[in-house]
Amino acid sequence: MNRNWLRSLTILAWAACGLAHADILIGQTADFSGPVASGVKETAAGAKLWIDRVNANGGINGEPITLVSMDDKFEPANAAANARELITRKKVVALFLTRGTPHNQAILPLLSEYGVPLIAPSTGAMVLHKPVNPWVFNVRASYQHEANRAIRHLSLVGLSHIGIVQVNDSFGSDAVKGAQEAFTQVNGTPLFTETYDREKPDFTKIQAAVTSQNPQAILFLGSGSAVVNGVRAIRATGSHAQIVTLSNNASDGFIKALGDNATGTIVTQVFPYERSLASPLVKEARQLQKAATGDDRVTPAMLEGFAGAKVLVEGLRRAGKQPTREKLRDALETLRRYDIGGLEVSFSPTSHSGLDYTDLSIIGSDGKFTR
């Protein structure tokens, strides 16, 4: 009897020990094999820099953080299915760095249904900013803010014949609102606005518009390989229009895919210059990258993941031991001017935007972003 009792006690002790030091599971669904895979992998690598650093120092109250990533191939239906599995079967505490506007929209109903926070979604969709969703915590500026700045910049440098090319999904229809607002602010109108199908991009109509209208610049609202192929189609018409696209394409993979069409392309950015040692955020990321790989070079996409991981970790720290989904959400609400390295992140019951930093970069002849 005593032997059985002791055996049971030992099992319970091991179980308690395992519970006390169980991994904190964080879920991610994103495109790891489709048209935006290169940027997704860079963003995840940036997040891993900070998560690995935290785990090496004991994790959160002795509990390591594990990022559970699933490939949705950039399909909204897959993103929703992955998110449901992460929430219901993997029992993640939060979702993190989910990529894509329609993909995040597909996930939104699950957040309130299961009471799960979504931290640092890798999209600037306004629907995640306004109205405030109590379960969504953004760590980057909106696409509308980026598109607005891009058009105002083009106007400032004297370009008025500006065309717009946009994908025909919720990302395109969201981002174009920022461009339209900017045209109103500078008393201008777009030379043309053309759309293309996200599933089966065909740029024939866009080539015709470029040929007939001869734009000085084109704001291209799309993602990854579609933008690469669209720019190739535009250049095939003989057009030398200035190409501008948004931060969702701010990755090394995008530059490489553009090939000979990369140089001179303007890409909006939502984090500081990745080669600037004046930015504490960049400096820290570069130091950790060098320690991990021997090379201190980081990319804008990596900085997005790095910044998001800093906010995630701080939320977990404030949530206390064995953080729950609700504790984490409540903890994130307490972030006020939280310094992640020269940038301050703030959340409140009336604002979950976190940051509104935007900048412009241009791809140089060396195949790197410059500012």
Regions found by a protein language model. Give the residues of each.
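Beta-alpha junction/loop-to-helix N-cap segments that form part of ligand/metal-binding clefts
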Residues: 25, 38-45, 57-127, 197-203, ...
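Extracytoplasmic "Venus flytrap"
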Residues: 27-48, 70-77, 99-102, 165-173, ...
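Extracellular/periplasmic Venus flytrap/periplasmic-binding protein
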Residues: 81, 125-127, 134-238, 274-287
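Bacterial N-terminal signal peptides that target proteins for export
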Residues: 1-9
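Sec/Tat signal peptide C-region and signal peptidase I cleavage site
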Residues: 17-22
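Segments of small-molecule ligand-sensing domains
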Residues: 291-302, 313-369
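Extracellular/periplasmic periplasmic-binding protein-like sensory domains
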Residues: 231-305, 367-370
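Periplasmic-binding protein-like
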Residues: 86, 90-99, 119-121, 163-166, ...
